[in-house]
Structure formats: C-alpha cells, structure tokens
C-alpha cells in the first residue's frame, strides 16, 4: 500500500513538473493511516523557478516515514519477517530534477530525472515530454515517455538484503481542446510495459492440501505485464455562481485480465474572495486477475502456476471522498506592506476518506503551503 501511494504521488508530481509555467515554492505534508494501523507521513518541498525567458527549472524533494505495527493477523501490510513481533519503521527519500525549455510560443520540451531510495527498494526514472498548442492555442497536444529501473529488495531473517530487478517503459498521448469559453475537454491514452520481478518479496500465499492443512509459500506473478488506460475529462466553469465542475472517466485493461472503470467528479467554489472550497468523489470498480484465487490448492505449486496474495488483483469496488480548503493570502499582502511577499501565496488543507468492499479503509490528511514568485 505504501509503495502504491508513493507511486501515485510521484506520477502526479511528474505530470505537474512537465509543463508548469508558474514559478512557485511549496511545502506539502501528507499523513496516511489505514484500518490496519499502518501509517505513512510525507514531507515534500517543490520548487519551480524560471532561469531564462523560456527555461524553467524544477526541484522536488520528498521524505516518507513508514510505520507498520507488529504482525497480529489483522493487518494487510507487507513487511519483513525479521522481528515481526515488533513495530517496523523505515524511511524513503526521493528527488526529482527537471528542466522545461520553450522552443517557440507554442512548443515546449521537458526532461526530468527521478531517484527514490529506501532500505529495501531503489528506483531511477528518466522522463521526456513535448507539448504543442495549435489552432490559436485552442488545442494542446502532449506526448510523454518514461523509462524506470527498479531494484526490489527483501530483508532476510539475518538482516541481509536479497535483490531483484525490474524495468518499466511507459508512454502517454494527450489532447486538450477548448470547446467554449467556459468548457474544456481532455482525452488521453497511457501504455505501460513492465518486465522483471513483479511480485512482492514479503507476501505469502496459503496453499491448502486435501486435508485442509496449509503451508505458506512466496507469491509468484508473471514477469511481464502490459497495461492500457483510456481516459476523458470535461471541465466547465459555472460563471453565475463563480464555480467550476469537472467529471472524468477512465477505462483500464491489461494482459493479466484485470479491467477497471473509474468515475470521478470535482466541484470548486469561491466561498469568499480569498477562500476556495473543493469537493471530490471517486468511484472505482475492477475485475480479478486471471490467476487470482480465493483459495489455492497444492496443485498450484506442483504445476508451477502463478499465485498471488495481492488484494489489488481481486475483484472489488472502492469509494473516495475528498474535501479541501484553499486560503489565498493576497488579501493580507495588500493590507500589509511588510507582507507583500505573500501576494501569490496560499495555504491548503485536504482530507480524503477511502474505503472499499475488501473491508479496508484509510484516511489521508494533506497540508500545502505555496509561495508564488
């Protein structure tokens, strides 16, 4: 779960780094806790600075602290077997460096490098992207490619670390179209190809024999996976009430026979001149991987068949509710000469509640402090 959250955060940041035109400095704090008493605290520093008229520099620094309680049979988190009766804690650090260069008034190219490291996991990525505006800037095309090399580690009983390798190649094509002065349509296609060690070294699968006795063995996934996603989003500004609303749909499928549907909507509203309210809801549903079983027999091991203990590969539905408040500090800057540096600054507080049909739930709290230049 922790790696999933970190991956999502990274992809969101990487996408923002690609083509942002605004100079800013921001500090973000995330807190995640789930129904198994696992928790992740993240602190991030983001900088976007214009070096020349058409050149932007980006820097992202992030530190995660992970806490997993002692194994008691109730937690679904993965962790080393070593000292399993004691809490497990570890840290993860990441850095993203990026440069965006304007070629002309309508074309930008960008390159980013990502490095992440923790005790038993290391990841490096190179990301390249290009965007171009057309038809009087009413249409925007974007292409992005990424290569990632991961070193997956397993902490053994004696404290040594066994490592496995995997790599990922991904690409994205997106188009944004202004339909009217108040409506924008976005369409995109994503392709992701994984190769190498795609299991979790800590997850164990129960194997039952004819007498209903069981033993645990390591899960075994295929060493390749090809994933596709098609998504569309429409955003509309409600001028009479100074608000906006958006809705998007995403269809996903892969060669493990997993398919999913995601529907999401967001409402944004100026409550006061300096206060913005955002409400978000997301529904997700997916089918199971072809090799997922609720109960595995010993024939699976004897035949060398694939097996998994990953709950994310079974059928389930999930719901996510979000609420955020953003307070713009421009009013304070206007009233105080000594605080004019806050003219483009804001404070944002976010809360997300997640739950699914697998009896799992989580709370995420996020605080952002942003300084614009």
Protein language model regions, located:
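Outer-membrane beta-barrel channels and translocator barrels
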Residues: 20, 52-54, 104-106, 135-137, ...
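Short glycine/proline- and aromatic-enriched beta-strand/turn motifs that initiate or cap beta-hairpins
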Residues: 20-60, 364
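Transmembrane beta-strands of outer-membrane beta-barrel proteins
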Residues: 23-27, 57-59, 109-111, 139-143, ...
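Transmembrane beta-strands of outer-membrane beta-barrel pores
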Residues: 29-33, 63-67, 113-119, 132-134, ...
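Extracellular loop and loop/strand-boundary signature of outer-membrane beta-barrel proteins
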Residues: 30-33, 81-85, 112-116, 129, ...
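Outer-membrane beta-barrel translocator/channel fold
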Residues: 34, 38, 58-98, 140-198, ...
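Residues on the lipid-exposed face of transmembrane beta-strands in outer-membrane beta-barrel proteins
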Residues: 45-49, 97-101, 128-132, 173-177, ...
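Outer membrane beta-barrel transmembrane domains
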Residues: 78-87, 200-233, 253-257, 261-264, ...
């Amino acid at each position: 779960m922790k790696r999933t959250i970190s991956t999502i955060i990274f992809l969101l940041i990487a996408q923002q780094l690609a083509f942002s035109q605004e100079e800013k400095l921001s500090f973000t704090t995330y807190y995640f806790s789930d129904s198994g008493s696992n928790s992740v605290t993240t602190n991030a520093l983001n900088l976007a600075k214009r070096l020349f008229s058409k050149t932007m520099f980006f820097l992202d620094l992030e530190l995660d602290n992970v806490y997993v309680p002692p194994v008691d049979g109730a937690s679904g988190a993965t962790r080393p077997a070593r000292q399993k009766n004691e809490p497990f804690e570890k840290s993860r650090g990441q850095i993203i460096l990026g440069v965006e260069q304007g070629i002309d008034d309508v074309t930008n190219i960008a390159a980013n490098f990502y490095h992440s490291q923790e005790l038993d996991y290391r990841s490096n990525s190179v990301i390249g992207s290009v965007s171009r505006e057309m038809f009087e800037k009413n249409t925007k095309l974007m292409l992005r490619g990424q290569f990632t090399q991961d070193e997956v580690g397993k902490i053994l009983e004696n404290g040594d670390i066994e490592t496995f390798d995997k790599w990922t190649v991904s690409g994205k094509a997106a188009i944004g179209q202004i339909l009217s002065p108040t409506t924008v349509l976005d369409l995109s296609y994503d392709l992701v190809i994984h190769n190498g060690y795609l299991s979790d070294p800590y997850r164990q699968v129960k194997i039952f024999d004819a007498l209903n006795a069981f033993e645990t063995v390591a899960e075994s996934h295929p060493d390749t996976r090809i994933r596709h996603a098609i998504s569309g989003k429409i955003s509309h500004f409600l001028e009479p009430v100074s608000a906006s609303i958006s809705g998007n749909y995403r269809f996903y499928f892969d060669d493990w026979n997993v398919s999913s549907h995601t529907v999401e909507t967001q409402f944004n509203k100026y409550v006061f001149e300096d206060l913005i309210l955002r409400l978000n809801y997301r529904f997700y549903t997916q089918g199971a991987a072809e090799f997922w079983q609720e109960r595995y027999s010993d024939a699976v091991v004897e035949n060398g068949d694939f097996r998994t203990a990953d709950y994310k590969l079974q059928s389930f539905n999930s719901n996510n509710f979000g609420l955020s408040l953003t307070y713009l500090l421009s009013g304070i800057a206007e009233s105080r000469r000594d605080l004019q540096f806050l003219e483009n600054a804001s404070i944002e507080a976010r809360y997300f509640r997640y739950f699914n049909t697998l009896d799992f739930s989580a709370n995420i709290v996020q605080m952002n402090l942003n300084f614009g230049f």
